[in-house]
Regions:
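N-terminal periplasmic/intermembrane-space "pro-region" immediately following the signal or transit peptide
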Residues: 2-3, 7, 17, 27-105, ...
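A broad helix-preferring feature
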Residues: 20-28, 385
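Outer membrane beta-barrel
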Residues: 85-115, 124-259, 265-299, 382-398, ...
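Histidine- and aromatic-enriched segments that form or immediately flank copper-ligand environments
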Residues: 118
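Outer-membrane beta-barrel pore domains
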Residues: 2, 36-40, 44-46, 59-64, ...
Length: 468
């Protein structure tokens, strides 16, 4: 009965999303007084960053962007990191824009391990649950963006359906200030370089979170899965950016946890986040970006820097016990170091784009501990990714190598997890793509009493994405 009720809830959620998406696609957001100017800037972005003209130009006219300083939810947002310091279109009063993203995967993965038996109530909890070929739960996001005043907008993202939650719930919501709403020359000159973000938002630690899959929004990830150590979370606080001539500096202070709390203040402290970088077009065909980020929390009851993805991983039930459930074991295949009490982390991310070739790297180290530990543990995390886009950027091939090495709580020797992901994709339109990957992941140096001892999973995952 419970499984039938769960199935009904999920089918209901997906049906609701499809109805909402259809309504939003036909909803008249505002008058088209600015359409000619908007179309021109949008066409340029599409030709440079996404699909080839003239078909891309026709698509751009049908999906005008009415929000300033905005990263598009479709393929125009590819290789965009921080929201651009560019109004994009003249302010013409209050504007509201809705969007959505939807994904569906088909998984064909096998797994194995060599752990010693751990029998409880006649069940070996170190054996692996049986898995086969089939569809995963559909994921969906709903976006609401509003231009409140000149240079001021608000963003709200909700998860309509995810692996970890079948019900609708809010991911984040924040205010972004890129200009002064008042006619003041001094403020106008200052805001040419500054950006403020306030609210409950996805923190800007590293650059991978701009390329990762965010539940239903999978258009910016060239592959299906995210990194092993998925540095992604939302926290409440504020950010200040300074940008000029390609240089970027960011400082942020947040509450240090995924949700606000006022109890037990002696066990909590703010998180401090910093970022420095450069992003420039060195030559007509060459773009270079290099950033370094740091994140620090001295004490917390439940810090989620590496456990903040409330959507779950894309690899269902891999290396899980027979009693695993889709929601409770939602992060199958991820490496979660267990730094809930304190954590200090840094990451360097290089990005190079030369014509159709994109290279992206992740060099990271994190140190911290849980509430029950007295000494810190260290994890090192590396990733290299290559993408080559061709046929007017509509087709691409991609590959990623990822390795994480460190000490888990209760396991004395260091362990290593490595993953390879070759794949590719096809942008049918700027809003619709299909992609596939082969994934192989190995677990090394885990004790024989751990279910991950000499564990391995490999296979293929196919994913379809709609985003607008």
């Amino acid at each position: 009965m419970n499984s039938q009720a769960e199935l009904r809830r999920r089918l209901g959620t997906q049906a609701t999303f499809l109805v909402v998406a259809a309504l939003l696609a036909s909803f008249p957001l505002r008058a088209e007084a600015q359409e000619s100017g908007t179309t021109e800037s949008t066409e340029t972005a599409v030709v440079e960053n996404n699909l080839s003209a003239p078909r891309a130009t026709e698509r751009a006219r049908s999906v005008p962007i009415r929000i300033g300083y905005f990263r598009a939810h479709d393929a125009r947002g590819l290789n965009v990191f921080e929201a651009p310091k560019d109004e994009g279109m003249p302010y013409d009063g209050f504007s509201l824009q809705w969007g959505a993203a939807f994904t569906q995967q088909f998984q064909s993965i096998e797994h194995e391990n060599e752990a010693s038996p751990n029998v409880v109530n006649n069940v070996d909890l170190n054996s692996l649950i049986g898995i086969g070929k089939g569809f995963n739960n559909a994921d969906a996001n709903l976006f609401m963006d509003a231009q409140l005043a000149r240079g001021i907008r608000v963003a709200l993202t909700s998860y309509l359906s995810s692996r970890h939650h079948s019900e609708t719930w809010v991911k984040d919501g924040y205010l972004l200030i890129d200009g002064s709403p008042w006619e003041n020359e001094s403020l106008d000159n200052l805001m040419k370089y500054l950006t403020l973000r306030l609210g409950h938002f996805e923190i800007n630690y590293g650059d991978m979170h701009f390329r990762r899959t965010d539940n239903g929004q999978a258009l910016f990830n060239p592959l299906v899965g995210n990194l092993l150590m998925d540095a992604f979370t939302t926290e409440i606080g504020g950010e200040v950016y300074a940008r000029t001539r390609g240089f970027l500096a960011m400082a942020a202070v947040t509450g240090g946890e995924v949700r606000g709390q006022v109890i037990k203040p002696e066990q909590r402290s703010p998180s401090v986040i910093g970022k420095l970088g450069y992003d420039g077009q060195i030559a007509p065909d060459l773009r270079v970006r290099l950033t370094g980020s740091v994140y620090k929390t001295s004490k917390s009851i439940s810090n989620t820097l590496y456990t903040g993805s409330r959507a779950g991983s894309r690899y269902y039930y891999v290396v899980e016990a027979p009693n695993a459930t889709e929601a409770a074991q939602a992060w199958s295949g991820d490496v979660r170091p267990g730094f809930g009490k304190k954590v200090t982390a840094w990451v360097v991310n290089p990005f190079i784009k030369y014509r159709g070739l994109e290279l992206f790297g992740n060099v990271e180290e994190a140190k911290g501990r849980s509430a029950t530990e007295v000494s810190d543990r260290t994890w090192k995390h590396y990733a290299g990714e290559a993408v080559y886009r061709f046929f007017g950027n509509q087709l691409y091939v991609a590959g990623r190598y990822n390795v994480a090495k460190g000490q888990l709580q209760g396991i004395s020797p260091e362990v290593t997890v490595n993953r390879i992901q070759p794949g590719g994709g096809w942008f049918l339109t700027q809003n619709l793509m299909a992609k596939a990957e082969y994934v192989q992941q190995k677990y090394e140096d885990f004790p024989v009493t751990d279910i991950r001892s000499k564990a391995k999973f490999e296979g293929a995952v196919i994913e379809a994405v709609v985003s607008f």
